């Protein structure tokens, strides 16, 4: 089971979802090292991109080791989206992904994200302008629709294909749902049936059973994993292996999870600097440690610390007895 996105062949049908504040360079690097068909940047505003805002440029930094990497753009002006796409192509992006799915109020009020599912004419102009501006493939991520009375993802997928889009990902919720309720994977079958380009299913893919059901119900060509990778950068690789072989690999042993956490922690400090790195690291440390004994107290203590060496030592001290218990 493989996915072809224009001229690019993915190693496997698993994509790391774009997630604001999560899929930065250190996290993408870890996921790609473990194994993942495609990693996607955090969503970036096209206006900030063409101004070459320093923070925005850091968010879309590409490494050869992460190939293929997609940069996700949000915006409502076709010419600006096109210019931002070209800038990212020049900076090494392998794929441009267009965001028609973000439900956040600030984005929607700016007539971007899922707001564009309510304006198919403007959506088409954005899709066409972006696809024509670059030589690399352009993809689209969207939701079922704005609400249950406007489930227009199949129609918008057809428009996207006509505009030159090479792959569509659908999150199985409406904008009105945000992340509430459960993802409707079966609806995505209607999108798959509407187009000839690959379709990827997204939403609530957090386990092997979910992978089975999502693919069976949607008929999709692949899966996009978002929150299922929180604290588990190895999960996309497990899913890749499972789809390829049918074998459900266990999570890495706890001492390897600790090594991964510390590698990630050091990478965040290097990428953001001490203060910024600690701020970003706290949520990841929380996700990694979820489910371990006394993890709530551990997270609370980490959140009060400001010395990076003290945090590193505290992480080791917290994991040590758990690793000993696992080895006993």
UniProtKB/Swiss-Prot annotation:
Keyword Flavoprotein among UniProt keywords: yes
Keyword ATP-binding in record: no
GO terms of molecular function: flavin adenine dinucleotide binding; tRNA binding; tRNA dihydrouridine synthase activity
Listed cofactors: FMN
SUPFAM superfamilies: FMN-linked oxidoreductases
Gene3D superfamilies reported in the protein's UniProt record: Aldolase class I, Putative flavin oxidoreducatase, domain 2
A Pfam cross-reference name: Dus
Domain of life from the UniProt record: Bacteria
E.C. code: 1.3.1.-
Catalytic reactions of this protein: a 5,6-dihydrouridine in tRNA + NAD(+) = a uridine in tRNA + NADH + H(+); a 5,6-dihydrouridine in tRNA + NADP(+) = a uridine in tRNA + NADPH + H(+)
CDD domains from the UniProt entry: DUS_like_FMN
InterPro entries, per database record: Aldolase_TIM, DUS-like_FMN-bd, DUS_fam, DusB-like, tRNA-dHydroUridine_Synthase_C, tRNA_hU_synthase_CS
Keywords, comma-separated and alphabetical: Flavoprotein, FMN, NADP, Oxidoreductase, RNA-binding, tRNA processing, tRNA-binding
Entry binding sites for FMN: 18-20, 72, 141, 202-204, 226-227
Disulfide bridge positions per record: none
Residues of the active site: 102 (proton donor)
Described purpose of this protein according to its UniProt entry: Catalyzes the synthesis of 5,6-dihydrouridine (D), a modified base found in the D-loop of most tRNAs, via the reduction of the C5-C6 double bond in target uridines.
PANTHER family referenced in this protein's UniProt entry, alphabetically: TRNA-DIHYDROURIDINE(47) SYNTHASE [NAD(P)(+)]-LIKE (PTHR45846:SF1)
Family: Belongs to the Dus family.
Name of this chain's protein: Probable tRNA-dihydrouridine synthase
């Amino acid at each position: 089971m493989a996915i072809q996105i224009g001229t690019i062949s993915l190693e496997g049908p698993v994509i790391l979802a774009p997630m604001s504040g999560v899929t930065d360079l250190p996290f993408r690097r870890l996921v790609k090292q473990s194994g993942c068909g495609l990693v996607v940047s955090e969503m970036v505003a096209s206006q900030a991109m063409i101004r070459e805002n320093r923070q925005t440029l850091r968010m879309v930094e590409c490494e050869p080791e992460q190939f293929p990497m997609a940069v996700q753009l949000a915006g409502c002006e076709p010419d600006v989206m096109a210019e931002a796409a070209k800038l990212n192509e020049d900076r090494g992006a392998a794929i441009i992904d267009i965001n028609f799915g973000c439900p956040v109020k600030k984005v929607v009020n700016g007539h971007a994200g899922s707001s564009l599912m309510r304006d198919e004419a403007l959506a088409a102009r954005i899709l066409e302008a972006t696809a024509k501006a670059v030589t690399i493939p352009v993809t689209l991520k969207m939701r079922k629709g704005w609400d249950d009375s406007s489930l227009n993802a199949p129609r918008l997928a057809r428009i996207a294909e006509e505009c030159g889009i090479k792959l569509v990902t659908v999150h199985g919720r409406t904008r009105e749902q945000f992340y509430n309720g459960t993802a409707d994977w079966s609806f995505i079958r209607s999108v798959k049936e509407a187009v000839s380009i690959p379709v990827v299913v997204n939403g609530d893919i957090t386990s092997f059973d979910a992978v089975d059901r999502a693919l069976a119900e949607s008929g999709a060509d692949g899966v996009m994993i978002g929150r299922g990778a929180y604290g588990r950068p190895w999960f996309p690789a497990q899913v890749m292996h499972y789809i390829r072989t049918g074998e459900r690999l266990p999570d890495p042993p706890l001492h390897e999870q600790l090594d991964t956490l510390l590698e990630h922690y050091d990478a965040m400090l290097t990428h953001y600097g001490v203060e910024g790195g600690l701020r970003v690291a706290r949520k990841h440390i929380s996700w990694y440690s979820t489910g371990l004994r006394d993890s709530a107290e551990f997270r609370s203590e980490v959140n009060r610390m400001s010395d990076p060496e003290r945090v590193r030592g505290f992480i080791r001290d917290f994991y040590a007895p758990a690793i000993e218990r696992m080895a006993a």
